[in-house]
Amino acid sequence: KKMKLRIIDLHTPTRNMNENFPDKVHPNVNGAVVLATEVYKVLTGRNIAHEIQSFPGFKSEWNGFDRYDYEYNGRQTIVVEPHIPLPGKPWIWRPAFFGAFASADEMLLERGFHVVYYDLTHDYGAPEAVNLGTKFYESMLHYYKLSPKVTLEGLSRGGFMVLNWAIHNVDKVACIYVDAPVCDLFSWPGEARKDMWRDVLNKWNLAEQEMVYFKGNPIDNLLPLAKAKLPIILVCGDSDKTVPYMENGKILYDRYTSMGGPIELILKENCDHHPHSLEDPTVIVDYILKNQP
């Protein structure tokens, strides 16, 4: 009162709007719009047109679909929304390389999937990254009502991340699509890539000498996925010089098969690490669609 500060009455505009305050305290989306509109009007003296977005952040367009960019727990987040979502709101999440070799993503959008990116690119599937991914997953269910069974997509190092996340969250996964995936950190980045290797040690909070006992590679921990019969589709080039197939995808395929896990392999002849995916991704998309809950 002494400072003659303006008081904005938000009670009167929201009176008799019980449906917009489900817990009688916190507003839902419509209630938040009413509050924001009233505050804006008092501060500026103007009314303003508004749009209720499906997701937070900056809205733009990606390949003809609505795209939303925002941060969650300090990490870049992108959600691309289908024109007509399928019942249950299925979604595919990749933690690395948004928009790269995205033919399968584009076809899934056309079929009614949400395409989601949450950036864990440079975390090497470490425990903290797995925890961040789980918190992000929970936010997508709680706030946006996406399906509790997510499809995971991992290209290259992203494959390491999605496999490790799935191992710790088997009940949350519909199926996995991995493409030229890193499955063994000793193969890629390997000790020869010294800067990246130091980064691996930092992310995993390990000393060099402790790596002798390292058991964090997904190919050493596939049993929970196999027991759950979690479907995996694996796309690889047989001439991959960056993430060698024989040291990564082949071991994943052989071990998962030996455990009775369902896995489909598409091995591209004379293909290096790039290009990822397939020119016609129908076989990938059909596999994902048939393995939804």
Please tell me what each predicted stretch does.
Residues 154-164:
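Glycine-rich nucleophile elbow surrounding the catalytic serine of serine-hydrolase chemistry
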Residues 1-48:
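Catalytic His-Asp segment of secreted/periplasmic serine-dependent ester chemistry enzymes
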Residues 144-156:
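Alpha/beta-hydrolase fold nucleophile elbow
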Residues 80, 242, 246-293:
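C-terminal catalytic histidine-bearing segment of alpha/beta-hydrolase fold enzymes
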Residues 198-250, 254-257:
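The feature captures the conserved acid-bearing segment of alpha/beta-hydrolase catalytic domains
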Residues 164-210:
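Hydrolase active-site cap/lid region
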